[in-house]
Each structure stands twice: as structure tokens, then as C-alpha cells.
From Swiss-Prot:
The gene is rplC. GO terms for cellular component: cytosolic large ribosomal subunit. It comes from Thiobacillus denitrificans (strain ATCC 25259 / T1). GO terms for biological process: translation. Residues 132-145 have a biased composition (Polar residues). This is Large ribosomal subunit protein uL3. Residues 131-153 are annotated as: Disordered.
Amino acid sequence: MSIGLVGRKVGMTRIFTENGASVPVTVLEMSNNRVTQVRTPENDGYSAVQVAYGSRRNSRVNKSEAGHYAKAGVDAGELLREFRVAADVAAQYQPGAAVSVEVFQAGQKVDVTGVTQGKGFAGTIKRHNFKSQRASHGNSRSHNVPGSIGMAQDPGRVFPGKRMSGHMGAVSCTKQNLEVVRVDAERGLVLLKGAVPGSKGGHVVVRPAVKGGA
């Protein structure tokens, strides 16, 4: 399995296949990925490649981070991510090396992780797809309430994990087995079939699919 890349969601559009079918795609900008560290079983107990994305002013980087980037010989990034790989794959990379979007190929399946769009405080119907209660026939002012949230004196508490009203969205989410439709190495763009989590401009992490094959 190859390493993944970090990028930014540009937005959605569509492209047309040779037979005229319309395919909705999400455009990801994934240029300027560079290796900051290579983990080895001898030094770290596992094999991995650490990648930085984007740029950050030196005044916004603390001393430990600045030293980490300086050791790798790369500019400070806005995001660091680590990808577990086999030892022979990790040996192919050196700190400071650039990583191109060509690690992905058209037709490949990938997993995409991002932070979902925040929806603010939401009730149980919108947040958990609860059903509304009766509109009339004995129901008064209890149309959209969740109903009972527990039992009586025993156990005398609400169980953890009970689905209730609360903040909706703004959580990490992974969509699996999205197809790579096109790779534009010149502009550092990757086009994926369908939607990915997050708002326009949000960070995303793209890895080879762990379940869906090549």
C-alpha cells in the first residue's frame, strides 16, 4: 500500500465520459506535499511516512515544530499527517522529498477523511432521523420532542450514548471507496467521484482504500 496525501477541498463540479454520461466529482488540491519524517521499526517500532501540507509563517510555528521542520529541511506546513506503510515502501522516501499526486491513479479506490460541515444545535429529528410524533389526536405541544430518555428510579440515570439533541456536524468523518476519476499532476489536482466530507477550503486526508481493493 502506498502513502496518502493531504489536501484541500476546492469544490464540486461534473465531467462527461466518452459516452456522454455526467459524473459528479469533487476537486481536491493536493500540491506541495513533502516528507518531514520517515519512521522505521529500529527507531520508532513501526514503519510510516510523515507528510506536511501547505505553508505557515515562521511566527506561527513554535520552537519544537520549527526544529522538526528544519531537521527535515522543508518549510513549515499548516498540517502534518502520518501514513503507516510497509518498511520497503517507507524506504523509498527521504525527508524533504516532494510527494506528487501521481501516487494515485485513475480508477483507484481511496478513503477520504475530513471534518463535516457544522450545523449548530439540532434536535433529534434532524440530528438522528427520529420520527415526529402525531400531529393531532391527543398530542398537544409534543410533536417534535424525542419522547422518553430513560426509565424510573432504577437505574435513575440516562445511559451514556443516548441519542438526544445537541451540536450537529463538525466531526471527523471518513468516506470509503471513492473512485479516483482523474489526476492532474501539472496542477496538483485529484478528482474523486461523488462528495467528500467538509466545506470548501477544508482539509482532507486521502489514503488508498483499506476495504475496496486497488
